[in-house]
Amino acid sequence: MELQSALENRKSIRSYLSKDVEPEKLTALIEAASLAPSWKNSQTARYYVIHTPEKLEQIRATLPEFNRKNCEQAPALIITTVVLNRSGYERNGEPTNELGNGWGFYACGLGSM
């Protein structure tokens, strides 16, 4: 698929099949996300695959109703977090500018696309 076509046809999926997803596909998604650019290549995004029914229910219980409803049939969730105080920060621990941790959140969003 050409990049332009992929960008133009991108959409947010809001309903899922309850069919299991092969671990290889989840790994491929995370590997692709890890290629996204980050501030000074700090690579602060972290990805966690949730696939056991008990953990899925625990995570769903924390979501706002709209999000909970959208993912109630999903057989797995990929949870994305950010290591704080690294991306957007200098080695001495001081933020580079007023955005501070915002750089990590920005990079996390890029990987989630």
Task: Give the ranges of each region predicted by the language model.
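Acidic, surface-exposed loops and disordered segments
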Residues: 1-113
